[in-house]
Amino acid sequence: MGADARPLGVRAGGGGRGAARPGTSSRALPPPLPPLSFLLLLLAAPGARAAGYETCPMVHPDMLNVHLVAHTHDDVGWLKTVDQYFYGIHNDVQHAGVQYILDSVISSLLVEPTRRFIYVEIAFFSRWWHQQTNATQEVVRDLVRQGRLEFANGGWVMNDEAATHYGAIIDQMTLGLRFLEDTFGKDGRPRVAWHIDPFGHSREQASLFAQMGFDGLFFGRLDYQDKRVREENLGLEQVWRASASLKPPAADLFTSVLPNIYNPPEKLCWDTLCADKPFVEDRRSPEYNAEELVNYFLQLATAQGQHFRTNHTIMTMGSDFQYENANMWFRNLDRLIQLVNAQQQANGSRVNVLYSTPACYLWELNKANLTWSVKQDDFFPYADGPHQFWSGYFSSRPALKRYERLSYNFLQVCNQLEALAGPAANVGPYGSGDSAPLNQAMAVLQHHDAVSGTSKQHVADDYARQLAAGWDPCEVLLSNALARLSGSKEDFTYCRNLNVSVCPLSQTAKNFQVTIYNPLGRKIDWMVRLPVSKHGFVVRDPNGTVVPSDVVILPSSDGQELLFPASVPALGFSIYSVSQVPGQRPHAHKPQPRSQRPWSRVLAIQNEHIRARFDPDTGLLVEMENLDQNLLLPVRQAFYWYNASVGNNLSTQVSGAYIFRPNQEKPLMVSHWAQTRLVKTPLVQEVHQNFSAWCSQVVRLYRGQRHLELEWTVGPIPVGDGWGKEIISRFDTVLETKGLFYTDSNGREILERRRDYRPTWKLNQTETVAGNYYPVNSRIYIRDGNMQLTVLTDRSQGGSSLRDGSMELMVHRRLLKDDGRGVGEALLEDGLGRWVRGRHLVLLDKVRTAATGHRLQAEKEVLTPQVVLAPGGGAPYHLKVAPRKQFSGLRRELPPSVHLLTLARWDQKTLLLRLEHQFAVGEDSGNLSSPVTLDLTDLFSAFTITYLQETTLVANQLRASASRLKWTPNTGPTPLPSPSRLDPATITLQPMEIRTFLASVQWEEHG
């Protein structure tokens, strides 16, 4: 079905080929579950074995085996909210009810023992499971044991791969796979990753899947040029070498591209949402079509098989929210299998068709013992036509993208304090604290229509609602934990609106205390900014010593903020006290308009490490200097906008939530000059730039800071002229970059990008802007032989280098047309999402030392300190223990190359611990890219580790007993992985290695 003729609620290229518009066809109710006695009798039949490859069906080694995969693709929010999809509400928007799909599938599987089905989205399945009776649950467990109901992927959602951070990916996969492990044991453990709908595929995602223990990956969306080449060269299946640092085969993943995205073949969609004809076998009927369908299928299977290297091929039989009447699907598949296989006897057909699963198909490929080609880059950007690059969603809904990243930060703080404080965090003086709601909400946000920004507006609003609801019980947990660890029960306040300078307590109280929690494994020095009233203030550190402070008037406001530097220990907190000075009005530092006097035309800000100079005529940044490394780089930064395409003579494709398609290659400047104001205090220097009524920026240097901070504010983007606009921040330099630039992959490893180039095929570039855009999750940089300019982001954005020495990041977009990919509404964001604030951190370094700066600063950007306020004067938590104003959960800091990725409660007496080497091989010219050894025995101060078990990345298998299928790449044999030592709690981390542990602990009595 083409992009301009698809049923409502079907993404172009996605589900529902041949589907009728929902709501227009009559549909039978799914059959009820058979009586329990019948089910138990059926399941007691001989031949039921433990789930695993041994439960796979028999194949014919001398025939073409067509593996039919019955499946449903259930978006965890898209056109409807998660709840609306589960319960089947608002079927006028899209006919979809997940609870009925699962009811119907289970019922139909029990009718015929050869039938198989896979399910993916655990966010839905877990909800359905908890609504079932014990008897039904046992029936399902038996189906899983027999391999007839099989889970693929197993994450809470099928996450996006462009706008997601690797930590959040790991968390959501852990949540879903833990449910399966707790519910079904090893029988329910998925063996393949199933990412059939994400709009492009990242290398880091493949690396994580390999480290999670998956044997292979199946996906559906592949660039149309890439797919054509792979079909011709039999390259749809290969080994993906997904890490440049981890030794093969640690991050090697067998990868298979599905032949029809994830849809059934043309004419073979037998769902109530489809309009294809069912099998009619009665030759007397004028509708008789059985012979025609069988012949069509044989031709189809033979043609498809020619694109693959073995005598096995796979067909997906299902699509978006299908199988609500599973009997309709399975009855026709039964007939297809019977009639096609009958041709083997009737006329010597060499095609064998069978119910199968992706895992069973993969098993047959593995047994073929072939040598496979190797891929080492990624699958971005994705295009499904010459002018249809799916690179717009890298930047869509920037406010939601930032809220998701903030929530990841807060969830890690919540998890850590729950681990450090022990059971007291969950039940304490502030009520019942719980990290689970935010963990689940964050998992939902990783869905490929959530953080991607590709849902309807009301669904995006619901995603934000889920996050907000998850923050509440985490705040209770933080209060309980901080009270226990500090020894003082305070009236804690959480100011969620500090980004817009709103915090009622700090703006009204004469005295208050500020608790700053540091989630990193090293001490940090951090500048605190709090909105305050028009008074003078004195700030004291945990020892009672007065620390420097400033009051700064806010731009475009009569409000003001208090600034003071805080030092916070590793994995711990410091409590500072703030007091008004009676009778003293503040000496507030107001922004000063730039002088027009000829002898004062230098506009610059500077600290000990960085100097930034601005053009006094235009107000634009024009030069950056690293004083420590004696580097000076002319760099011009300004805001531009692309005029969004509404279609032209080359293509009717418009820019939308998914698609980025500008009208012209050259963007327009928001303004050629900025009205500027200068702020200089002992703690901070700022240049406030006002480009227009809807675009402004503060360029900032704090004392001691080694990067330049650009805090931009964009919106509401004006569209009254009838043009959608896509706003970028662009940096132009004199660096000779030779068409190269570099972006991160999900916040971890770095990939080299070359303009107008793809490593695995000769690109025919049809969109010189959109076709060169890539996801930027945490950083983008350009460099020559000496200097490197890096920009760190505070959320996922799209970015590129469209000419040598230049790089750009898209910060916001507002569009007037729907791009024809199923959402059915333009990306207008008429609510608060129109006004967005964010930060870019700019680093200038020598190439050989740049990694130290951007790695350590990016870590700080993802896990920033959590600020909690209180009036002070709280009651003691322990009557016999004095309160403390400083605490560290570590007895010694982690080395700079080691990141504490996860510290979270697993059960009542067990913690989940992940430690990560955050540098790549050869990335640092010093020793930060070297292996590092840690002793975990007495590392933590709040608890003692009594027993330690190492697991796979998602903690669903012991590492020592986990195994994966072995493949032979054409690069030569890979060495057997050497076992990682744990002796008894001393571990070594190799570059880019993550090691995961379940630690039995005993908490200290008073923390």
Swiss-Prot record:
Localization (cell): Lysosome
Keyword annotations of the record: Disulfide bond, Glycoprotein, Glycosidase, Hydrolase, Lysosome, Metal-binding, Signal, Zinc
UniProt-annotated stretches for the region Disordered: 1-30
Cofactor annotation remark: Binds 1 zinc ion per subunit.
Signal sequence bounds: 1-50
Intrachain disulfide bonds: C56-C360, C269-C274, C414-C474, C495-C503
Compositional bias annotation for Low complexity: 1-10, 19-28
Residue positions of the active site: D197
GO biological process terms, semicolon-separated: mannose metabolic process
Binding locations of Zn(2+): H73, D75, D197, H448
Post-translational modification: Processed into 3 peptides of 72 kDa, 41 kDa and 12 kDa.
GO molecular function, one term: alpha-mannosidase activity
Cofactors required: Zn(2+)
Enzyme class (EC, first level): hydrolase
Disease per UniProt entry: Defects in MAN2B1 are the cause of lysosomal alpha-mannosidosis (AM). AM is a lysosomal storage disease characterized by accumulation of unbranched oligosaccharide chains.
Family stated for the protein in its record: Belongs to the glycosyl hydrolase 38 family.
Name of the protein described by the UniProt record: Lysosomal alpha-mannosidase
